[in-house]
């Protein structure tokens, strides 16, 4: 084995020279230079400084403006809540551990940080699944005269949390475990060791199939059908230009969110799968650190995409920030988000 396994940890560094120490007790400077840990700390500080105000502002603006409380926006707000969990429960911990170059909070802190990171990522993924299904049902209309209402949104929210907890909670109760990964400053599911005492391999397979592959299949199926339907409807002019434009704008926003999710999380999932299928092989700490920390940027992109692509929300945000006045003078209410409930692009 090209790494060193201990109680509740696996360090990707051979202990032939006797330098490996527990990542819960000693700085890991034998894995990387001090400046590299400083870079990680600075990066986490940046994510916190951006992630908290952006996601909090998303929630606050929606509470302040009743016209933003639409069923589709409930799902988007769910993403903001998940991101705040990641920022407050995970990023602050990782910032502090990076400053000390080891996981100073011990196995319990590792469990909490790993749980919040996994929970936030899974809520984001399953929220995108719900958004994809909503787009498919509203645009493709497999069920005649179906409207995505408040009850459907609440059911979608419940699904995201149930599925996210079904992925993030098992390592806390004995099915797999959370351990420090990469440079040992953040925690994730143990892809590195078989750990038969906690049935680790079965959990990783379950996680990749149920909580990654199946959601991806659903998302790609829904958008494949959606693209075909929108093209057919546009070609036959079955709906007004205004309705088609509204649907395209909402769909474009959600598709960009999916693409951004893939950009952030596929590298991490790919590296994790490689490590799982090549346990004991030689790889350095940076190999997992870069995709792991890059995936954390997902806490920022969703609200940024939402703010940039939703004119109604952008106007409400400016009104809130400027004490009730929109400096752009644009108070248009009828926008993409408000049209989502009533738009009906029929299939060919």
Swiss-Prot record:
UniProt's post-translational modification comment states: Phosphorylated on some or all of the serine and threonine residues present in the C-terminal region. Contains one covalently linked retinal chromophore. Upon light absorption, the covalently bound 11-cis-retinal is converted to all-trans-retinal. After hydrolysis of the Schiff base and release of the covalently bound all-trans-retinal, active rhodopsin is regenerated by binding of a fresh molecule of 11-cis-retinal.
Highest taxon of source: Eukaryota
Alphabetically, the GO molecular function entries are: 11-cis retinal binding; G protein-coupled photoreceptor activity; metal ion binding
Which positions carry Phosphothreonine? 335-336, 340, 342
* Residues bearing the modification Phosphoserine: 334, 338, 343
Motif window: 'Ionic lock' involved in activated form stabilization:
134-136
Gene Ontology terms, cellular component aspect?
membrane; photoreceptor disc membrane; photoreceptor inner segment membrane; photoreceptor outer segment membrane; plasma membrane
Alphabetically sorted, this entry's keywords are: Acetylation, Cell projection, Chromophore, Disulfide bond, G-protein coupled receptor, Glycoprotein, Lipoprotein, Membrane, Metal-binding, Palmitate, Phosphoprotein, Photoreceptor protein, Receptor, Retinal protein, Sensory transduction, Transducer, Transmembrane, Transmembrane helix, Vision, Zinc
Q: Which residues lie on this side of the membrane: Cytoplasmic?
A: 62-73, 134-152, 225-252, 309-348
Keyword Secreted part of the UniProt annotation: no
- Pfam families, from UniProt? 7tm_1, Rhodopsin_N
| Disulfides per UniProt | 110-187
Q: Which SUPFAM superfamilies match?
A: Family A G protein-coupled receptor-like (SSF81321)
Q: Where is this site: Plays an important role in the conformation switch to the active conformation?
A: 113
Q: Which residues carry this modification: N-acetylmethionine?
A: 1
Main localization of the protein? membrane
What segment(s) does the record annotate as region Interaction with SAG?
330-348
Outline what the protein does: Photoreceptor required for image-forming vision at low light intensity. Required for photoreceptor cell viability after birth. Light-induced isomerization of 11-cis to all-trans retinal triggers a conformational change that activates signaling via G-proteins. Subsequent receptor phosphorylation mediates displacement of the bound G-protein alpha subunit by the arrestin SAG and terminates signaling.
Family statement: Belongs to the G-protein coupled receptor 1 family. Opsin subfamily.
| PANTHER family in the cross-refs | OPSIN
What is the name of this protein?
Rhodopsin
């Amino acid at each position: 084995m090209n790494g060193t396994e201990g109680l509740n940890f696996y360090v990707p560094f051979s202990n032939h020279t006797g330098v490996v120490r527990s990542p819960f007790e000693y700085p890991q400077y034998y894995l990387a230079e001090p400046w590299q840990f400083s870079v990680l700390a600075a990066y986490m500080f940046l994510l916190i400084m951006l992630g908290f105000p952006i996601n909090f502002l998303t929630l606050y603006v929606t509470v302040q403006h009743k016209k933003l409380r639409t069923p589709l926006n409930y799902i988007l707000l769910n993403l903001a809540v998940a991101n705040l969990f990641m920022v407050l429960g995970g990023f602050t911990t990782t910032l502090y551990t990076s400053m000390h170059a080891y996981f100073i909070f011990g196995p319990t802190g590792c469990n909490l940080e790993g749980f919040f990171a996994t929970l936030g990522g899974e809520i984001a993924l399953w929220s995108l699944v719900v958004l994809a299904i909503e787009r498919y049902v509203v645009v493709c209309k497999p069920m005649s005269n179906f409207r995505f209402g408040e009850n459907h949104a609440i059911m979608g929210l419940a699904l995201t949390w149930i599925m996210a907890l079904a992925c993030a909670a098992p390592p806390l109760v004995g099915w797999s475990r959370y351990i420090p990964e990469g440079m040992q400053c953040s925690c994730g599911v143990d892809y590195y060791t078989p750990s038969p005492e906690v049935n680790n391999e079965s959990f990783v397979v379950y996680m990749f199939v149920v909580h990654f592959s199946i959601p991806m299949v659903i998302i790609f199926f829904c958008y494949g059908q959606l693209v075909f339907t929108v093209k057919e409807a546009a070609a036959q002019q079955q709906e007004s230009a205004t309705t088609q434009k509204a649907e395209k704008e909402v769909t474009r926003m959600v598709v960009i969110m999916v693409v951004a999710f893939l950009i952030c999380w596929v590298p991490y999932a790919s590296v994790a799968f490689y490590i799982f299928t090549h346990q004991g092989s030689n790889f350095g700490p940076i190999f997992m650190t870069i995709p792991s920390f890059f995936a954390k940027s997902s806490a920022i992109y969703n609200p940024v995409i939402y703010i940039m692509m939703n004119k109604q929300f952008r106007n409400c945000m400016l009104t809130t920030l400027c004490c009730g006045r929109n400096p752009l003078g644009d108070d248009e209410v009828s926008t993409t988000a408000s049209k989502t409930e009533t738009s009906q692009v029929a299939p060919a």
